[in-house]
Amino acid sequence: MRLRRTLLTLALAAAVFGAAASAQTPADRVDPFIGTTNFGTANPGAVTPHGMMSVVPFNVMGSEENVYDKDARWWSTPYEYHNKFFTGFAHGALSGVGCPELGALLTMATTGPLTVDYREYGTSYTAEKASPGYYSVFLDKYGVLAEATATARSSAERYTFPEGTGHILLNLGEGLTNESGAMVRRVSATEIEGTKLLGTFCYNAQKVFPVYFVLRVSKTPSAGGYWKKQRKMTGVEAEWTPDNGRYKLYTEYGRELSGDDVGYWFSFDGLAAGEQVEVRMGISYVSTENARKNLDAEQAADAPFDAIREQARKGWNEALGRIRVEGGAEQQQRVFYTALYHALLHPNLVSDVNGEYPLMERSGETGVTDGERYTVFSLWDTCRNLHQLLTLVYPDRQREMLRSMTGMYEEWGWLPKWELYGRETFTMEGDPAIPVIVDSWMKGLRDFDVAKAYEAMRKSATTPGAQNRMRPDIDPYIEKGYIPLGFYAKDLAGDTSVSHALEYYMADAALSLLADSLGQGDDARLFRARSLGYKRYYSPESGTLRPLHPDGTFLSPFDPKAGENFTAAPGFHEGSAWNYTFYVPHDVEGLAKLMGGRRKFIDKLQMVFDEGLYDPANEPDIAYAYLFSRFRGEEWRTQRETRRLLERYFTTAPDGIPGNDDTGTMSAWAVFTMLGLYPDCPGEPYYTLTSPTFDRAEIDTERGTLVIEKHGEGYIDRMTLGDKPLKNYRILHDDLLKGGKLTFELQTGK
């Protein structure tokens, strides 16, 4: 647990660590404040592994003291480490995303005269603490200690008040989401229920969905009621309306209330100093009835707050404890377990305790599963490493995610791309469900409907563009082998044709592997041939991949550095040609031949790192450091660059993630790299090896415990798998698990 703004002397820190190190659990090594600035968009809120519910401090509105304000700029997280103004706890949030969504259902504790305007009731705060499944903060204006914990589908908050009158507020008008509209209904003096509309993620105005809630307070209030922001009127109407343009308190109204800016308040008179009021909330994306079922099933009426908190912590220790590391610096262990923590947040549950969930793209209709249904499939990001991590260490969860994806196809007709609570947002490009499913299949996860999955993949890889929701620009891709400039975006500054094509090449390479595994030889050859179309983009003149016009000529003039720092670059999405040129993980040797051979490939790739052209926060080049190891004698470069990247970009500071965590993708890179292996080609059942960070790691897998040991420091001299020497730096998943123990012998020289 971390106490922000508290200074410890080095001597005290050393003494405490020395005494407690042996007793530390994995959860003790997690710092939820890592990644909460530098646009990492992580947050320190309370959540369980893959939980539907998260309880997140909301500090991005209401005060000029804040460095960042959600209403003053594009902003995609409910919490920023450097902000100072707290306006409540949000219930349900996304971690590591680039567009604003969720972060609503804001609860707040206040004292003194009642006010429901967040600009007035917000407060500075101190003494933040966060650990897996728990968050607390002291609200300066009110002298209130606010604490939060969570179960999979519900939350618990505990507010410790000073003497006097206290209030609990539920603000349904504000939040991170850009959507508006809510309803709240009084059920009893201590319980309310309702719904809030969410959606419009990443410019998708029609992709909206409701969240339902039931909220209970532990103490009977002395008063309670609704509020609503009144519309601004002029003239005579304004003269007759005392609440014109302001928040109106409804003290004599007891039925439901709807509107864009509504809420509910509970007041408690005569509180003793130190008296506590607890708030419990259940949520559902199906119905209010299910929100109540979720709350009742996961929290007994008399369950103490501390028991719920301890259960959340236990769940995290069980999940994090599937990987146990020894050695390395204390800070490295903290980086590792925090990265693993972030990698276990999304995808998250969307099914309720009764198995019900919102059907994919069938608004208002409900499905039922006898397992678990998952949501938040940010697949352009997570197809590269996060699902591979789940396959290796958490296969049961990955199976449910595979079933969730194939279920979406059965309900909607397409696999997901960037799915969010039953809505497809089409964010980013490519056909990223294919490499995820293929990768799992090739690594032995086969108890899902692979025939249905293959049908879905083949559909998106062959359907003409006018009818193709996954690949609307597939026609020239099939006819020409590439996507020309101007086909997808007439404005060349917004054209991302090369990026689109590269994603399709990778997906088709993976699909060819599955086709071959299923005995579909003709399909295997077809999709493999398509995956090599990237060669048409290679320009000997620039030495990079380069956008093509419809007539097959290269874009000119052309600057391969254009696109750095998210500036526009024709053909490329959020990056430069250098961020994409080596993004052919399924044919690295073929790309090297195009470049003039191994030596030129290595020199050019090394130049990308040496001249700062590598973007550690961008997915297409995320595996670049591992490409050196495809060539014998160059493996030391992989070890050097991965070590440098870890040391520079992954730290224990609040900015200790290199930009947006992308629902755990950057964190999954760190987890794999610190263990000494990485899945450098999505869909292929291989890992590329590098020097591990830790002296020993034990990883629980379906086939037993995989042990990774490191002896010495520096560069790899020898490796053994089991009791046999290992010469190849690329190893099959099956061989790794069969071997059981991977040992690295390091020496100081290369």
Feature-to-residue mapping (PLM):
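Bacterial N-terminal signal peptides
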Residues: 9-18
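Sec/Tat signal peptide C-region and signal peptidase I cleavage site
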Residues: 19-23
